[in-house]
């Protein structure tokens, strides 16, 4: 059943919609008179009407008050009068407030009353008079402004007597915290020093508040702290260097001349600063003059005078700080202007150090005018800790001077050195071992007590090592004569002094120069070195000893430049030894190769009456040639294993090279003595070697086009008229950016010798390079050079595959020259080299006929 339409409502009665809207708050009538004069219930208030009539001056009527809508506005004269009254009240209040805050009136009042500026409160609202407070009495402030200022200024004077005990307590507590902070800094307790400094700042702020007349909470005063034991009390303050002493607090002075200078500031009756109208401005201007003069002296190159002026200028900062804290200072000893300082110091220099007693120097060193122009040498310390502290203070002062002079780099350097000394002091106090040789020493400082200076030889390393070599030579010359070789003793007596090394050859294996260096510093490592590290150390020490001996031989032969070069290498090897002992890795590929002394370290003895047969000379020459070849092979294999980092194989081949050298020396000595060639035989020895081209980088590949053999000539050209050149193309990094080049033209031959090297850029780990190696290789094209009107003619092509570079570091092939796919009979010899194979190592087994000399043959 479908719902029917809703029944329509009847027409709404007229006026019902407006009534509903008014009921909902719409169409409300607002009158401006209602909003200004108030609500309806206040219209018939008789009190308000009477007050209004009294204000307007009209008589009260008994009739009914007209409606607000018909009320006439107030006369303009009354409105202007009310506005003038309101404005007059505000102006009077502002005028009174301006009188209370007028600085000129307050200054004039202080001069009349004689009240000190420091004891006057900064804000009159904080110290209020209980009798004249307008908040407590609720009265209007109708008193004159001068009377208010008098009450405000007299309040702190009443409170000054009550705060005498609190003032003395705060000063005593400040003195306690300063001593505790200094003791903690000397003991190296940074945390305690920071706590004391925070408490000191709190006490200073509380003392400043008390001096200004403000109230403080006594419960918030920091408690006293224990001073503790200072590590070293200075027994001779007169001998202390002014450069290492921290700035002492300024001297205190009172009106009474018989009163000691160390009296407290609260006891002094009249501070000296009252005699000077503005001591702070005078001190600031004088400090600025000294800084400008120091900067000018530094720019002029007078560094000593610049340091002196900067040191005096820094002392003004301590005096200004004391003046800000309210402490009285004595300006009678203030240094003069910088331009008057130099003649005054020259006249006072002979008598100044003996006039001032030590006590006065400690109480009032801030404004001392007689600063020594030259730095005083520090006294020798009695303990290690005292010496370290002296050096720490020296470097701190140097850092401050450098920063004040604008040299930030030098300041950071001195701060780093000071940090090293702080760590050393902390470690020494903890009982740990400290390597004092690594700490820099300031100029002019004596050595640390109980330790010998081991750094003197570093000033001239070459001269010191040569001197040690001279001692070694003198020690070897004094060796017994019964340790000589099998030589006629009468012959040695007839030799000149330049041939004296014959007698010292047996003593060379026991050269003490390997123990000369300060190697015990590496003994601080707790773990014993591993076998590989021991092998590295043995290799490096043997190599260093070899270069030291070579330097000694070069010095004896008057070749000082060569001796210095060998000593530099020995010093570098010494640094590598220290690095290896400390556990850090050493790059053996950078270790220099062993020296190959072609002349040998022996003397050839020539006998005029000895003549060898032609056959014996040929045998000697052949044996020497074989020994030299075997020695060179051993050195080559040793170098290859060194670049691989294989210490064991490197040492093995170096020993074989030394054995070959020794056999060669024996052979040459036998030949010099005129003996028959020694008995010898050959042994087959197989060596496992690793091939590497150390002169190549890992990012380059060498292509060498060696020669062409029987290259075909193009039609119309005879083989003898062939002008051939080779062009190659290597598709890396891609085909569009292939690396291309060509050889020079070799004319008039079909077997040209090119022997030309090309360097190709590669990336061993790139996938594109490996793809080119495995699939594409290198393409070669052989051309015949055309004439002026003729272009180049293609002779043939060749292709070299590079898959063998995966396991080999060199490919040497003779590739066939093709004409399309047809062989032409020509050949092209090429080589490709990498530093190392792409994967693995190029291990080769080499078999040699090893020459062995029998000792019985001599």
UniProtKB/Swiss-Prot annotation:
A single cellular component GO annotation: nucleus
Basic and acidic residues bias locations: 186-199
Tissue expression profile of the protein: Widely distributed in brain and peripheral tissues.
All residue ranges annotated as the C2 domain in the record: 676-815
Compartments (UniProt record): Nucleus
Sites of Phosphoserine modification: 209, 593
One Pfam family it belongs to: CC2D1A-B_DM14
Entry protein name: Coiled-coil and C2 domain-containing protein 1B
Name of the gene this protein is made from: CC2D1B
């Amino acid at each position: 059943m479908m719902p029917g339409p809703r029944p329509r409502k009847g027409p709404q009665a007229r006026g019902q919609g407006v009534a509903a809207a008014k009921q909902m708050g719409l169409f409300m009538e607002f009158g401006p008179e209602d909003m200004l004069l108030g609500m309806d219930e206040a219209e018939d208030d008789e009190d308000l009407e009477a007050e209004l009539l009294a204000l307007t001056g009209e008589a009260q009527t008994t009739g009914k008050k007209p409606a607000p809508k018909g009320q006439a506005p107030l006369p303009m004269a009354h409105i202007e009068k009310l506005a003038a009254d309101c404005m007059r009240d505000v102006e009077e209040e502002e005028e009174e407030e301006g009188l209370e805050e007028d600085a000129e009136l307050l200054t004039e009042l202080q001069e009349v009353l004689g009240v000190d500026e420091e004891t006057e409160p900064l804000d009159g609202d904080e110290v209020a008079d209980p009798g004249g407070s307008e908040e407590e009495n609720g009265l209007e402030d109708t008193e004159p402004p001068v009377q208010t200022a008098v009450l405000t200024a007299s309040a702190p004077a009443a409170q000054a007597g009550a705060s005498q005990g609190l003032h003395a307590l705060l000063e005593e507590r400040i003195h306690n915290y300063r001593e505790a902070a200094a003791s903690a800094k000397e003991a190296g307790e940074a945390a305690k020093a920071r706590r004391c400094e925070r408490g000191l700042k709190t006490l200073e702020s509380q003392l400043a508040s008390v001096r200004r007349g403000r109230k403080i909470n006594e419960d918030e005063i920091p408690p006293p702290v224990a001073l503790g034991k200072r590590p070293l009390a200075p027994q001779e303050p007169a001998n202390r260097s002014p450069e290492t002493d921290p700035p002492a607090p300024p001297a205190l002075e009172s009106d009474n001349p018989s009163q000691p200078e160390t009296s407290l500031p609260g006891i002094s009756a009249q501070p000296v600063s009252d005699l000077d109208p503005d001591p702070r401005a005078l001190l600031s201007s004088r400090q600025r003059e000294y800084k400008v003069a120091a900067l000018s002296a530094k720019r002029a190159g007078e560094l000593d005078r610049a340091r002196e002026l900067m040191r005096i200028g820094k002392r003004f900062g301590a005096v200004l700080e004391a003046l800000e804290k309210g402490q009285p200072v004595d300006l009678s000893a203030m240094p003069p202007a910088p331009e008057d300082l130099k003649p005054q110091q020259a006249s006072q220099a002979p008598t100044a150090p003996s006039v001032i007693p030590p006590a006065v120097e400690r109480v009032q060193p801030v404004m001392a005018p007689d600063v020594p122009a030259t730095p005083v040498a520090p006294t020798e310390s009695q303990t290690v800790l005292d010496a370290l502290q002296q050096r720490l203070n020296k470097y701190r002062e140097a850092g401050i001077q450098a920063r004040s002079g604008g040299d930030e780099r030098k300041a950071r350097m001195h701060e780093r050195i000071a940090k090293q000394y702080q760590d050393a002091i902390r470690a020494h106090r903890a009982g740990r071992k400290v390597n004092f040789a690594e700490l820099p020493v300031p100029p002019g400082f004596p050595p640390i007590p109980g330790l010998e200076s081991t750094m003197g030889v570093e000033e001239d390393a070459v001269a010191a090592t040569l001197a040690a070599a001279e001692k070694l030579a003198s020690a070897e010359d004094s060796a017994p004569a019964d340790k000589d070789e099998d030589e006629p003793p009468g012959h040695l007596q007839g030799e000149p002094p330049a041939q004296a090394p014959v007698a010292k050859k047996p003593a060379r294996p026991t050269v003490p120069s390997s123990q000369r260096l300060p190697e015990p510093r590496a003994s601080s490592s707790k773990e014993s070195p591993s076998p590989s590290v021991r092998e590295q150390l043995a290799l490096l020490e043997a190599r260093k000893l070899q270069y030291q001996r070579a330097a000694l031989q070069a010095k004896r032969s008057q070749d000082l430049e060569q001796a210095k070069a060998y000593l530099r290498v020995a010093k570098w090897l010494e640094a590598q030894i220290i690095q290896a002992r400390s556990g850090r890795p050493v790059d053996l590929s950078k270790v220099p190769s062993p020296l190959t002394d072609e002349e040998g370290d022996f003397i050839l003895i020539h006998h005029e009456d000895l003549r060898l047969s032609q056959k014996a000379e040929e045998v000697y020459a052949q044996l020497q040639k074989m020994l030299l070849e075997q020695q060179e092979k051993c050195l080559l294999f040793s170098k290859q294993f060194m670049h691989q980092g294989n210490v064991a194989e490197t040492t093995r081949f170096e020993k074989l090279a030394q054995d070959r050298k020794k056999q060669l020396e024996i052979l040459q000595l036998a030949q010099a003595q005129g003996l028959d060639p020694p008995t010898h035989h050959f042994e087959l020895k197989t060596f496992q070697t690793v091939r590497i081209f150390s002169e190549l980088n890992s990012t380059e590949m060498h292509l060498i086009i060696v020669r062409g053999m029987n290259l075909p000539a193009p039609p119309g050209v005879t083989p003898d008229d062939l002008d051939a050149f080779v062009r190659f193309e290597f598709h890396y990094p891609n085909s569009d950016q292939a690396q291309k080049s060509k050889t020079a033209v070799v004319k008039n031959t079909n077997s040209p010798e090119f022997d030309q090297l090309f360097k190709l850029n590669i990336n061993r780990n790139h996938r594109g390079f490996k793809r080119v190696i495995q699939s594409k290789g290198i393409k070669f094209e052989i051309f015949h050079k055309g004439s002026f009107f003729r272009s180049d003619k293609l002779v043939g092509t060749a292709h070299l595959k590079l898959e063998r570079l995966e396991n080999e570091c060199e490919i040497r092939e003779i590739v066939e020259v093709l004409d399309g796919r047809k062989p032409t009979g020509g050949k092209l010899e090429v080589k490709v080299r990498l530093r190392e194979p792409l994967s693995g190592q190029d291990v080769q087994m080499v078999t040699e006929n090893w020459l062995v000399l029998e000792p019985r043959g001599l």
